[in-house]
Amino acid sequence: MSISQLFILSRRGDSIIYRDFRRDIKKSNDIFFRNVNFFTEEEIAPPLFNVDGINFIYIKTDDLYIAISTLDNSSPNYFLEVIEQLLKVIKDHIGVLTEETIRKNFVLIYEIIDEMIDFGYPQLSDSEQVK
């Protein structure tokens, strides 16, 4: 159950945070954003979808998309839990999660990601362990 890429995008599709763990997929945040925006306001994009063999799992907050891409056909709930735990730890360290706070604290966020996910394999999920 490995993660190929993790990215945080603004609602406009700008890449704020991008980490390629396994280098087995070309940069896929553009593919993700085009497919999420394919849905209309009345329709909601599913939290998991597949494009050309790449699985995208994401959570949308008010202004941000936090997404994982993987080639594994593992449980989507597992990947959603990884995203939830990552968001929780980031919020514990920087407070409110907005595009501005991410840009101001991007070095810290990359350090958190590197502590929690090692070569695409989630390791730590508790704020106390990551500190």
Locate predicted features.
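Acidic, low-complexity cytosolic segments
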Residues: 1-131
